[in-house]
Each structure stands twice: as C-alpha cells, then as structure tokens.
Amino acid sequence: MEGIGKAYLDYNATTPLDPLVIGVITESLKCEWGNPSSAHSLGKLASDRIGRSREQVAAMINAHANDIVFMSGGTEANIVALQSGLNSITKPNSKECNIVLPHVITSNVEHDSVKNYLSVQQDCGKIDLSFAQVDKASGQLRPESVLSLVNNRTCLISVMHANNETGVLMPIMEIGQALKALNVSRSQNNLPKIYFHTDSAQSLGKVKVDVKQLEVDYLTIVGHKFYGPRIGALFVKDLLTQTPLVPLLQGGGQERGFRSGTENTPMIAGLGQAAELVVQNLDKYMEHMTRCRNALISNLKDQIHDIRINFVVDPRLPNTVSLQVPQNVTAQKVLENCNGKIFASLGAACHSNSQKPSSILMASGLSPEEAGRTIRISIGRTTPDSEIEFAVKVLTEACKRA
Ligand SMILES: Cc1ncc(COP(=O)(O)O)c(C=O)c1O
C-alpha cells in the first residue's frame, strides 16, 4: 500500500483475503452452489467441499475433523462454547445438578463477546463469575491467578489465547494441563468437570496453535483474522462422545444438528483454504512478522525520543506493537496527523467509537493517560519492508507536529 502513500497496519482488526482464498471462494460460488443437503450430485459436490474444508481447518489446529463445527464467526463460536460449558452443569438430571450456582472463571482482558455474555449471565443470577487479573505492567496472566479461583462449583474457564490489543500470549497450555490433572481428582470426589475454552481469534496464523498441546475443550476460530472469509468455527474436543455442544440455532439439523441453517459453502471453502495456507506457511509468516515488528520498533526508537513500546514480554504475538507516543501528545492526535496515511487503531476495532481509554490497556497496567497515548499497530504476513519504513516516516512527522 505504500506505493499509493498508505500503510495498512491494523491486521488485528481484520485481514484482506489471501488471493488463493479468493480463488477458491470464486470457484465455489460458481460450481458448488448446490444445497449441501440435497441428495443429487450438485448437493454432493457442495457437501464434499465442506468435508474437505473441515479437514483443512482441523489440520491447522491438530484436531479431528469431526470436532469442527462451522459458525458465522468468532462471536458466535465464543457464545456457543460458553453456553455449552455452562449447560453441562445446569441441565436437569445431570449428576452435578445439585450445584446451586455454577461458577465460571474468565480473565479481565477478554473480548467483549466473552466478557459481555458472561456478565449478562451473572446479572441474571445464572452464574457466579470470577475475573482472573492479568499482571499490571506486563499484561501477562499467571496460571495461578486462574487456578486459585477454582472452587467446588466451578464448571467452566474461558481465557483467550492472545490479547487483541496488547499481543500478550496467555498460558493456555499450563492452565489446560493443570485442569486435566485436577479434573481426574474432581471426578473421584464427585465434583463437576471444569471445561476449558480458549478464544484463538488472534493467535491463528501468527503462532502455532495445537489443541492437543493446549489441552482445551473448546477453541474459537475466526477466519477474517488469518486472511480467510468472515466466518468462523468452533473446535469441540471429542464432540460426539465427550464434550457438550448446545446449538444456538435450531432448525433443519445441518452441521450434524449442531448448527442449523443451510451451510455457506463458498465461505467454508475459503476458510479451509486459509487454514491450509497457515499449515503450509506458518513458520514463514512468523519469521516475516517478527522481522518487520523488530525493524519498526528499532526505527521508531531511533527517530522519536520518549516513545515507549508497551508489553514487550515473552511470549507475545509476532505482529503486534503497542506504541506509547511521547507525553503531552495523544494517540488520537498523532493518528489524525498521519492524514489518513496510516491505518492503525487506538484499540479493538469494535471500540473505535468510544472516547474512553481502552479498559484492556488499563487492566494491563497502563494509567488512563498512558492508555490515551497508545496506538495499536499490527503487522501482516505480507507487509513489505518499504511499508514499515513509510510508517516510521509518517509517524515520526505526526508526533513532531503533535
Ligand atoms: C480476540 C477476539 N475474539 C473474538 C472476536 C470476534 O470476532 P467476530 O467479530 O468476527 O465475531 C474478535 C474480533 O475482533 C477478537 O479479536
């Protein structure tokens, strides 16, 4: 984009479609438009395509294809995972039904689709909700901060894999392994199983995601964050035998009854292709984003005094830079001074109309004033070096003028 005097650095908000994904979607729109439930050959063509995509998406996270259910996106996948985990304890005749109030644990930096759904359940008196706090200063979550909140009524834990604003990776594997051991002893003591969900919207296509290593029961997949279409999927461990899935949509019984509504074959085809690209190229993507990020940080530091890079911790996403501009300047002003040449954001895209400093950044240790001086820059897998150089030049001038 720098060739036309612009740099897109907002890949955590959304990514463009990869050209190969566009190709597969286009082909599918033309040839696989039959209803996947139809018994004739056009239906079979579409349902075969969906089966192939399911395998591609499963391969991206080292899962079994049977454990993938296609959905409209990350918000739906998060809500279905949460309501399913909760249902395990509230359904009539379940052995845990004597539990008066199910207890759920989440972190204080989750995406709104998790935070707001759980907060509403709490406000309705349906659950008791605890928030594990990330460490102020680092934005990191210690496994003990989550595990120490577990009690005899806990039935569900939801912690995101990577934070969309800070880029900090959360200790999902450590929590998952601890829960696996804990669930063995809970079962012996007739206590409810604790289901574990992670929202992987921001980590797929940026770091390795392996559901077996992470030891999760549910994992949210969002296509438009890894150069795929604007749909998603939910991984449910041993879906048919072990982990409950409560459908949000009832109807014709598509997706084996777990998500009714005629399948969006072309977009599902695109999601499969996007997943396959991640399988083939993840190391290359990671290497490229890390190099661009490091170049951006060192060039910005050379050019602008008094800037700070927040949340430089290990592990973190290779593509996200939380840039704190110098004192007496606001991030809003700096972005305005870029005159539309830099596409970056002050925080999550869904909060772009808010005048308030980001609650995620404040929960992660920044003061309101520091949060108001923070720009989120997120790099893509194909961002050219020249676009990084262009962004440094424009941001430097914008800070000086501000
Ligand atoms: C961490 C995280 N979870 C969930 C979502 C929701 O995805 P969607 O808006 O596609 O439903 C997003 C999107 O910004 C996200 O960043």
Spans of features found by a protein language model:
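Pyridoxal 5′-phosphate
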Residues: M1-A402
